[in-house]
Each structure stands twice: as structure tokens, then as C-alpha cells.
Design a protein with these regions (language model features):
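Acidic, metal-coordinating helix/loop segments flanking the phosphotransfer/catalytic sites
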Residues: 30, 43, 55-75
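Conserved acidic carboxylate
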Residues: 33
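Charged docking surfaces used in two-component/phosphorelay signaling
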Residues: 40-48
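C-terminal output helix
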Residues: 43, 126-139
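Acidic catalytic/metal-coordinating carboxylates
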Residues: 58-61, 85-90
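Active-site residues of response regulator receiver
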Residues: 79
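Receiver (REC) domain active-site loop signature in two-component systems and cognate sites
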Residues: 82
Length: 141
């Protein structure tokens, strides 16, 4: 289980019922998370499930990656609270450039969501299976 409490991060990686895929899905996710250990766990889970993943520490890095690889990115998976540029601001920028970009926001603070973006949300803490299920659900919309 990914368990995050307050500003300090407690991480537990539990067992999963989801088996790794044998072939990549060919879908690409731009993962934006400022906590390195959390970003690494999420990226590993997504890659093991067959997704291609670009990783960014903050919104500014994500914008640069989107400039370089935007055509191949299927989903933005972003933390909402980050330094320099939060997830909502980043989502606004990227949706302004590509209206059909799939969005999934993760946060321990669900009160900060922007209804105008019509984004999907996953509240921390959550399990690996919860993450993979929600990612698949959003990509399939």
C-alpha cells in the first residue's frame, strides 16, 4: 500500500493481485510527483503493468517533457500539491494545449479540486491495485 501521511511520507509496498502484463500497453503516462520515493514507487508500478512513463518532479519539468513528447502522452497523472506549479495549474496549461488529454490527480487534500477541469481523482493513501485500476478506468473513457 502507498501510505502517505502529512508532509512526512510513510511508504508501504504491499502485495498485489494484479499480475504484470507480458506486453506493453503502448500507452504513455506523464507522472508528476515531487516526493522522489513516492514518484519511484508509482513509476515502478505503472511500468510493471506495461505503461511507458515519463517522470517529472514538478509542473515546470512536466511542461518541458510535454513540449518534447506531448504527442505520445496519453495521460497526465499528477500530485495536486507541489512546489513551483501545482497539479491544477499544470492540468490547465496542458489541457489548454490538448483538450483530450486524460487527467488523473492524486492528493491527500481532495478539497483543492477544480471542477472546471472535470478531472478524475484518487485520494491518498491508496494501494497499487487502486492506482492501476483507476489509471485503466481513466484511459478507457
Amino acid at each position: 500500500m502507498f501510505d502517505l501521511q502529512g508532509r512526512s511520507t510513510l511508504l508501504r509496498y504491499g502485495t498485489s493481485k494484479t499480475q504484470p502484463m507480458t506486453e506493453p500497453t503502448l500507452e504513455t503516462i506523464l507522472l508528476v510527483e515531487d516526493e522522489p520515493a513516492v514518484r519511484n514507487l508509482f513509476a515502478q508500478a505503472l511500468k510493471r503493468a506495461g505503461y511507458s512513463v515519463y517522470e517529472a518532479r514538478n509542473g515546470q519539468e512536466a511542461m518541458k517533457l510535454f513540449d518534447q513528447h506531448g504527442e505520445s502522452i496519453d495521460m497526465l497523472l499528477t500530485d495536486m500539491r507541489m512546489p513551483y506549479m501545482g497539479g491544477a495549474e499544470l492540468a490547465h496549461h496542458l489541457r489548454g494545449r490538448r483538450r483530450n488529454l486524460k487527467l488523473l490527480c492524486i492528493s491527500g487534500y481532495p478539497g483543492n479540486l477544480d471542477a472546471e477541469l472535470a478531472i478524475d481523482f484518487l485520494a491518498k493513501p491508496f494501494s497499487r491495485d487502486d492506482l492501476l485500476k483507476k489509471v485503466r478506468e481513466v484511459l478507457d473513457k
